[in-house]
Every structure is written in C-alpha cells, then in structure tokens.
UniProtKB/Swiss-Prot annotation:
NCBIfam families in the cross-refs: PRK00346.1-4, PRK00346.2-2, surE
InterPro entries: SurE (IPR030048), SurE-like_Pase/nucleotidase (IPR002828), SurE-like_sf (IPR036523)
Binding locations of a divalent metal cation: D13, D14, S44, N102
EC id: 3.1.3.5
SUPFAM superfamilies to which the protein is assigned, alphabetical: SurE-like (SSF64167)
This protein's encoding gene: surE
Cofactor remark from the record: Binds 1 divalent metal cation per subunit.
Record has Metal-binding as a keyword: yes
Protein name: 5'-nucleotidase SurE
Keywords carried by this UniProt record: Cytoplasm, Hydrolase, Metal-binding, Nucleotide-binding
GO CC entries: cytoplasm
Entry's Gene Ontology molecular function annotations: 5'-nucleotidase activity; metal ion binding; nucleotide binding
Organism domain of life: Bacteria
Length: 260
C-alpha cells in the first residue's frame, strides 16, 4: 500500500507572488502534497497581528498554469493565513507548515517582529510542526537558488523526526553561493536589538509625519548565536518556543510580598 504523502502548508509575509515563496513551493513539491495560503500583498513586520475588526477575503488563484496544487490569496496577515487554512480550507491537518522564503534576515530579535516567523508560530500553536525560512538578501532580485539544498535537508529532517510541542524552527540562510555556505549550525538567538530613529518630515499640507529608521546593534559576542553562524557563512537554525514564561524568575518573583 502506498504511503500517503505529507501535506505541506506553504505561506509567507512577502505576498503570494513573491519570488521567495515560489522557490519554497518548488522545493516542497519534491517532499509532499502542497497547498499555498498566503497574503495578497506584502505583510512584512506584522508580527503576530490578526484581523479581528475587518472582513477577511480568501480566494483561489492561479499563479502558474502548470501548477497542479491549489493556491489561495488572503487579504489578511500571515497568522490569518494559517488560521483560515487550517479552519476553512484544508480537509485534514497539515503534516508541516513552512513560511518564507523571506527577503531579509529574521535572526536575533527580528523574530519578534517577523510575519514570516509568526505564521510558523501560529502553526505551532495549532500543533503543526513548522519552519520559517529567511534569506539575508533584501534585494528584489535576490537569488534564492542557493537556499534549495539547505531547505530540503532541514525540511526532510523535520518530516522524519518531528518537533516538540511548542517549538518551531527559525532558519536563516546567508547571502552566499551554495558552494560558499559552510553548512548548517544549530544556534541560540543572539541578544541583539534595534536602535530606532524617526525621520521627521512635513507633507505639502503642513502636517508632520515620521519614517521609522534605525540600525541593528549586536553586542552579543557569543560563538553559539545565530548572528555568529551567519557571519561565518553557516545556515543558522534556532529552535523557537512561544511559551513566553520566564521560568527562571518564577521562584524569585514568588518570594515578593505581593499579598501584603
């Protein structure tokens, strides 16, 4: 008896027509049955936002005539896409959800703001093994071909071994040729941050407005971080948990005089 192929849900935050998701779809088609539910427009930096005070549209679309799998374009956020896919579109629970390939880094603190990773986290919340993939190239002409080998390797391992409940993977791939990438490293998230700046301007009507700018600052010198791995030419893999409890502080917090 033929073993049923794994069902793989593909989404992203750059939009359903973005080059990154097209590469991801092609790789996933080699590993299972694919269905795509992705935003109809770019949703970068949306984090785990969901649509609760507006209508949500989701319709089947044809991106390529040669595709035999189904694709759906959704007016909502990446997290919305996963929710509506699992609750309204799919007839069975996916074996895996993959999100990406993002244009740009989602390493370190960027994971908090990332729509790419929030889609993966939403899948994890729903008990679906999930991976977020990002390429450290913000160019509209980014070359995603070097990512294929590493995405396939990591995905095959997740399909084979599964992931613990409450854990998803954050994968970042350096902007290098495939032959220049040294391998894959399991890492921790670097303790870095953004130093934000606001560019204050005035529009023709005299109304002030702001553009958010800033720079990424990493003072974490640890050799086991995602930032260090990427700097050295490795693909970084960070196991991410969405239980935000600071377990190490519970005992100390319990000693406070909170009921006095």
């Amino acid at each position: 008896m033929n073993k049923k192929k794994p069902l793989i849900l593909v989404t992203n935050d750059d939009g359903i027509t973005a080059p990154g998701i097209r590469t991801l779809v092609e790789v996933m088609k080699e590993l299972g049955d694919v269905i795509v539910v992705a935003p109809d427009s770019p949703q970068s930096g949306m984090g785990h936002a969901i649509t609760i005070s507006d209508t949500l549209f989701c319709e089947q679309v044809t991106i390529k005539e040669s595709y035999k799998h189904k694709e759906y374009s959704c007016s909502g956020t990446p997290a919305d896409c996963v929710k509506i896919a699992t609750q309204e579109i799919l007839h069975r629970k996916p074996d895996l959800c993959v999100s990406g390939i993002n244009h740009g880094s989602n390493s370190s603190i960027n994971v908090i703001y990332s729509g790419t990773m929030s889609a993966a986290v939403e899948a994890g919340i729903e008990g679906i093994p999930a991976i977020g993939f990002s390429l450290l190239d913000y160019s509209l002409n980014a070359d995603f071909e070097p990512t294929r080998k590493f995405i396939k390797t990591i995905t095959k391992n997740v399909l084979k071994n599964g992931l613990p409940i409450g854990v998803v993977l954050n994968v970042n791939i350096p902007k290098l040729k495939e032959a220049e990438i040294k391998g894959i490293k399991v890492c921790r998230q670097a303790n870095a941050h953004w130093e934000e700046e606001f560019d204050k301007r005035t529009n023709p009507q005299g109304r002030e407005y702001y553009w958010l700018t800033g720079k990424f600052v990493n003072k974490d010198e640890g050799k086991d971080t995602d930032e260090k791995a990427l700097e050295e030419g490795y693909v970084s893999v960070v196991p991410v948990q969405f239980d935000l409890t600071a377990h190490h502080f519970i005992k100390d917090l319990s000693s406070w005089s909170l009921n006095d």
